[in-house]
């Protein structure tokens, strides 16, 4: 049994997780001919509801695989297989726009230059990537506006921000902010670092998602 993008099934009032618990514990777990594979791009949902589940699915995971985006080298190999004749500088620029997300890279037309591809995908009225930002955050997070407010603040501070600084900008603190920062980190949108000898409150959060950085530098001001 293979379910792709499982988090999308768990809609409000669906009781999907409870149903999955009953399916596995009440029937599938006793069978030797069942292999159950679940995948999803909403990392925070997968961790909370499957990997770190404290209910009926606790300790039911045999193995987990976190599929990371392509590295810069892997992006180069992928584009070469698409017969892109770009030099390494263009490939680097492409990586800084799209990151290592295979779906984004699959949209590239190798017959066009990087500039032509970016213009077609991001800035034309019918561009596939034109509305990707809102769709992405709304698909991954409930209360997406709160998550967007955090990445927007971080996009304006390339040296990073402390939790206290983020809280002052977005007006949220406590457990809510902790959950938002944790989920953004799980999904590789942000990173955190702490200098040796510094206290936890001095932890620095930085925006690291290339597409989000590109969006706030070029697309947000264009669409507004």
How should these model regions be labeled?
Residues 1-224:
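Phosphate-binding site recognition
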């Amino acid at each position: 049994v293979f379910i792709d993008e499982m988090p999308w099934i768990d809609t409000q009032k669906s009781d999907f997780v409870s149903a999955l618990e009953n399916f596995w514990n009440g029937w599938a777990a006793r069978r030797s001919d069942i292999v159950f594979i679940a995948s999803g791009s909403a990392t925070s949902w997968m961790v909370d509801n499957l990997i770190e589940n404290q209910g009926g699915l606790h300790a039911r995971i045999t193995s987990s695989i976190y599929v990371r985006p392509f590295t810069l080298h892997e992006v180069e190999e992928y584009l070469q297989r698409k017969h892109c004749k770009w030099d390494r500088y263009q490939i680097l620029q492409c990586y800084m726009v799209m990151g290592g997300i295979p779906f984004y890279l699959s949209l590239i037309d190798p017959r066009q230059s990087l500039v032509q591809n970016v213009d077609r995908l991001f800035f034309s009225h019918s561009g596939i990537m034109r509305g990707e930002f809102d769709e992405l955050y709304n698909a991954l997070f409930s209360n997406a506006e709160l998550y967007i407010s955090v990445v927007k603040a971080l996009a304006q501070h390339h040296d990073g921000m402390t939790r206290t600084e983020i809280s002052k900008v977005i007006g949220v603190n406590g457990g809510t902010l902790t959950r938002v920062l944790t989920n953004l980190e799980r999904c590789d949108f942000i990173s955190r670092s702490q200098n040796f000898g510094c206290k936890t409150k001095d932890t620095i959060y930085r925006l690291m998602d290339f597409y989000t950085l590109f969006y706030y530098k070029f697309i947000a001001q264009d669409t507004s």
